[in-house]
């Protein structure tokens, strides 16, 4: 996994896919991301909602984040899929919020070997909430090495979205390693916005 930039697109998934196919992208398969809130059984300001996420690129992993004010201070973990089974046993403390679950399903494209672009339709239950695009630059895991190039790629391909960089791009000035949790944080933030859409 390289460095990813996730954003909500204003176009339909088909429109985005046509843009990608127009620049020579090859369809590689499908992808799925889900974002599932687990709320405290009794409302409390002491305990935060735990967000459990899965990404088809990491099929044996579960990502868990308790969102706070920003990424750096939010408790987070990467677990194996057995974590989902443990959550079921914690029903006395954490209750799954099925109504708040966001699923993103779509297609994965490869562009000139170095770029992977995932385009998916986000749904909450049976309601379509929007289109989410993940642009991944595969050759590096260091944000400062590729963030300007990624902004240029997004500007050239989509002619927009390049000015709203992900939070992790803005707060990283040193050559730190990017991880899948950074990608999942971006999906979490987008899912929170999508839930509020009517």
UniProtKB/Swiss-Prot annotation:
Coiled coil: none annotated. Component of the Mediator complex. One of its GO terms (molecular function) is transcription coactivator activity. It holds the Pfam family Med20. It comes from Caenorhabditis briggsae. One of its GO terms (cellular component) is mediator complex. Keywords: Activator, Nucleus, Transcription, Transcription regulation. Component of the Mediator complex, a coactivator involved in the regulated transcription of nearly all RNA polymerase II-dependent genes. Mediator functions as a bridge to convey information from gene-specific regulatory proteins to the basal RNA polymerase II transcription machinery. Mediator is recruited to promoters by direct interactions with regulatory proteins and serves as a scaffold for the assembly of a functional preinitiation complex with RNA polymerase II and the general transcription factors. It is found in: Nucleus. Belongs to the Mediator complex subunit 20 family. Disulfide bonds: none annotated. This is Mediator of RNA polymerase II transcription subunit 20. The keyword Transcription applies. It comes from the Eukaryota. GO terms for biological process: regulation of transcription by RNA polymerase II.
């Amino acid at each position: 996994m390289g460095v990813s930039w996730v954003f909500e697109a204003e176009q339909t998934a088909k429109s985005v896919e046509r843009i990608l196919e127009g620049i020579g992208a090859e369809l590689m398969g499908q992808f799925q991301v889900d974002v599932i809130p687990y709320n405290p059984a009794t409302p409390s300001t002491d305990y935060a909602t735990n967000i459990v996420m899965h990404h088809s690129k990491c099929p044996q992993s579960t990502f868990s984040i308790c969102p706070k004010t920003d990424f750096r201070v939010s408790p987070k973990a990467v677990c194996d899929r057995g974590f989902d089974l443990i959550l079921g046993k914690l029903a006395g403390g954490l209750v799954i919020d099925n109504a708040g679950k966001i699923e993103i399903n779509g297609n994965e494209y490869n562009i000139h070997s170095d770029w992977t672009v995932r385009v998916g339709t986000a749904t909450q239950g049976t309601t379509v909430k929007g289109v989410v695009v993940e642009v991944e630059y595969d050759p590096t895991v260091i944000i400062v090495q590729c963030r300007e190039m990624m902004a240029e790629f997004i500007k050239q391909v989509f002619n927009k979205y390049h000015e709203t960089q992900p939070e992790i791009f803005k707060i990283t000035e040193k050559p730190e390693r990017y991880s899948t949790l950074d990608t999942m944080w971006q999906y979490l933030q987008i899912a929170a916005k999508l839930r509020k859409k009517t």
